[in-house]
């Protein structure tokens, strides 16, 4: 590539007599005389052997590195971390999951700015890799592209497709006596057949789909299987497109705008995506200095139908969506009905409308994954924002497809995920109960763990349609049922959820978007006078730092909000 028609950031380390020592170091990692005028591009490589989500990423990094060199750039590969949500789920380790989003963002920002890089190609697989990378891109605002590690293919057992959620639910089924130990083990052995992120429209696939919709990843790339050759080819193509974006000086904040975030949220609704996307897009918007609130999600939910029949509540997985036309097919339907901003810029330099020009107006009739406009799965989006005296700042719930959209019942109160799971597996939760899991919020956990173990146990025990669950923690993208998370303010800061007592009547009313505690204001005032914040669970280390800095979930659980106010 020709040198860009503007000074490169990397010139501060590659040009001039004073930078001779800097160049000496760069020569040791492969730079030649002719390379010092080329753009230096960081490859944030989240390869790891601790999780199937990331085990195939090294190949993608190598393909991207070669393509960047061929395009006239100087790639520099650096590592960033990952946490396996599926492996840490239900343990103390899960407290580090959301924390890892900030560590990933901070580490990428640190390397790219610390080394004065001219561009960034980030590759991620497990859930927090995606928002962590995008937060960094929004902060840095150097030309950047995201490459998804790819989705896992479904497992198969006894004539049905399996995902990791099948294994979590099998635990509840076994505990309730509905399956044998041999069947439990068979599900365990077949649920995860190879490399790739969890296969339904769970958090990883939700975020990758949203990034494609936003224009920060290439078309069709978010639903490719990790093990297929087209995934590696897309990594190389992403590198080529990034080199062109550097030449054209297309930056993340040219792409990450209010309108493109609305596009991403619209696609999240249309594909039936994860509630975690709410938390992550609030954080991405904060990093990009784009105004966004919980109420914006509710506004978009009301106008966008669910078009895709995908797990966890539906039938199909991401690879099925890919074969049916992928995210571009979903986007074309939304664009045709005025639900996308077609003039938004993408990393390729094209607008959304230009990218979608040759995509069919309607999905193929010989598939069942993507519904046509006139026959949606649900007429409105599934991620709702609930408010009420139990969640004055708001709470997040999946409401479409719930068989019991309104539950009023006695509170069953637990101050940790572990104590709740123990009660469920012991058969102590009854139909009509409203389970409350608190002190699991951003500060209180800390880290806002996902409650997949208790929710899966409820489903597995056959209580999914008759028991409600609310928490100041989060839910996995694999969760479904009458569950309400992200309750804010959280218990640790004295939110109303801290004042709930065993047996209090609670109403979860999805159609009314209401979360109500049937206790008088006078009684709540008496309880508040008696309440005192608990001792911090951690006083040193990363969890202590996180708990001290993190904001409310209603603001994205970010760690750099109003630091100097």
Curated annotation (Swiss-Prot):
**Cofactor(s) in the UniProt record:** [2Fe-2S] cluster; Mg(2+)
Q: Where is the active site?
A: 476 (proton acceptor)
Q: What is this protein called?
A: Dihydroxy-acid dehydratase
The record's section on PANTHER family has: DIHYDROXY-ACID DEHYDRATASE DAD, DIHYDROXY-ACID DEHYDRATASE, MITOCHONDRIAL
**Enzyme Commission no:** 4.2.1.9
What's the source species for this entry?
Synechococcus sp. (strain JA-3-3Ab) (Cyanobacteria bacterium Yellowstone A-Prime)
- Single GO term (MF): dihydroxy-acid dehydratase activity
The record, for Pfam families, names: ILV_EDD_C (PF24877), ILVD_EDD_N (PF00920)
Which residue stretches, if any, does this entry annotate as coiled coil? Answer: none
Please describe what this protein does: Functions in the biosynthesis of branched-chain amino acids. Catalyzes the dehydration of (2R,3R)-2,3-dihydroxy-3-methylpentanoate (2,3-dihydroxy-3-methylvalerate) into 2-oxo-3-methylpentanoate (2-oxo-3-methylvalerate) and of (2R)-2,3-dihydroxy-3-methylbutanoate (2,3-dihydroxyisovalerate) into 2-oxo-3-methylbutanoate (2-oxoisovalerate), the penultimate precursor to L-isoleucine and L-valine, respectively.
Listed under subunit, the entry gives: Homodimer.
Pathway note: Amino-acid biosynthesis; L-isoleucine biosynthesis; L-isoleucine from 2-oxobutanoate: step 3/4; Amino-acid biosynthesis; L-valine biosynthesis; L-valine from pyruvate: step 3/4
Entry keywords, A to Z: 2Fe-2S, Amino-acid biosynthesis, Branched-chain amino acid biosynthesis, Iron, Iron-sulfur, Lyase, Magnesium, Metal-binding
The protein's gene is named ilvD
- Name the protein family: Belongs to the IlvD/Edd family.
Reactions it catalyzes: (2R)-2,3-dihydroxy-3-methylbutanoate = 3-methyl-2-oxobutanoate + H2O; (2R,3R)-2,3-dihydroxy-3-methylpentanoate = (S)-3-methyl-2-oxopentanoate + H2O
Give the modified residues of type N6-carboxylysine.
Answer: 128
Residues annotated for [2Fe-2S] cluster binding in this entry: 53, 126, 198
Q: How is the cofactor bound?
A: Binds 1 [2Fe-2S] cluster per subunit. This cluster acts as a Lewis acid cofactor.
Question: Per UniProt, where does Mg(2+) bind?
Answer: 85, 127-128, 450
Sorted alphabetically, the Gene Ontology BP terms of this entry are:
isoleucine biosynthetic process; L-valine biosynthetic process
């Amino acid at each position: 590539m020709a040198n860009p028609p503007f000074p490169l950031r990397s010139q501060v380390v590659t040009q001039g007599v004073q930078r001779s020592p800097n160049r000496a170091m760069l020569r040791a990692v492969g730079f030649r005389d002719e390379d010092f005028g080329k753009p230096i591009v960081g490859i944030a490589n989240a390869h790891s052997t601790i999780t199937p989500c990331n085990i195939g990423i090294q190949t993608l990094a190598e393909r991207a590195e070669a393509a960047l060199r061929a395009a006239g750039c100087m790639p520099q590969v650096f590592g960033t971390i990952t946490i396996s949500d599926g492996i840490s789920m239900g343990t103390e380790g899960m407290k580090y999951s959301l924390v890892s989003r900030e560590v990933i963002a901070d580490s990428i920002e640190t390397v790219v700015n610390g080394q004065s890089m001219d561009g960034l190609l980030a590759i991620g697989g497990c859930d927090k890799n995606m928002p962590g990378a995008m937060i960094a891109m929004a902060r840095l605002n150097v030309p950047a592209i995201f490459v998804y590690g790819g989705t896992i293919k479904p497992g198969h057992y006894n004539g049905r497709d399996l995902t990791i959620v099948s294994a979590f639910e099998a635990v509840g089924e076994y505990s309730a006596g509905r399956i044998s130990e041999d069947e439990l083990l068979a599900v365990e052995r077949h649920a995860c057949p190879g490399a790739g992120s969890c296969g339904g429209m769970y958090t990883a696939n939700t975020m990758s789909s949203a990034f494609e919709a936003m224009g920060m990843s290439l078309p069709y790339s978010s639903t490719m299987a990790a093990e297929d050759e087209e995934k590696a080819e897309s990594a190389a193509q992403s590198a080529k497109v990034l080199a062109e974006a550097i030449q054209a000086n297309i930056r993340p904040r040219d792409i990450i705008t209010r309108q493109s975030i609305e596009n991403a949220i619209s696609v999240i609704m249309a594909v039936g995506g994860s509630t975690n996307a709410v938390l992550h897009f609030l954080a991405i918007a904060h990093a990009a200095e784009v105004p966004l609130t919980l109420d914006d999600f509710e506004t978009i939910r009301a106008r966008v139908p669910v078009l895709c029949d995908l797990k966890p509540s539906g039938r199909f997985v991401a690879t099925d969506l890919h074969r049916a036309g992928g995210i571009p097919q979903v986007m074309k339907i939304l664009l045709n009905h005025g639900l996308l901003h077609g003039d938004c810029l993408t990393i390729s330099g094209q607008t959304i409308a230009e990218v979608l020009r040759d995509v069919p107006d309607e999905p193929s009739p010989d598939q069942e994954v993507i519904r046509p406009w006139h026959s949606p799965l649900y007429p409105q989006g599934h991620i709702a924002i609930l408010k009420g005296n139990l969640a004055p700042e708001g709470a997040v719930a999946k409401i479409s497809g719930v068989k019991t959209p309104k539950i009023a019942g006695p509170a069953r109160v637990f101050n940790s995920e572990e104590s709740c799971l123990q009660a469920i597996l012991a058969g102590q939760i009854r139909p009509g109960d409203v389970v409350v899991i608190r002190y699991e919020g951003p500060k209180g956990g800390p880290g806002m763990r996902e409650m997949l173990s208790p929710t899966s146990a409820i489903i597995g025990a056959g209580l999914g349609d008759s028991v409600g669950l609310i928490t100041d923690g989060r839910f996995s993208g694999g969760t479904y049922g009458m569950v309400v998370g992200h309750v804010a303010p959280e218990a640790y800061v004295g939110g109303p959820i801290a004042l709930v007592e065993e047996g209090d009547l609670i109403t979860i009313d999805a159609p009314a978007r209401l979360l109500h505690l049937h206790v008088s204001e006078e009684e709540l005032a008496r309880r508040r006078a008696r309440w005192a914040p608990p001792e911090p669970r951690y006083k040193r280390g990363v969890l202590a730092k996180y708990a001290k800095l993190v904001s409310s979930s209603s603001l994205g659980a970010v760690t750099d909000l109003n630091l100097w106010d």
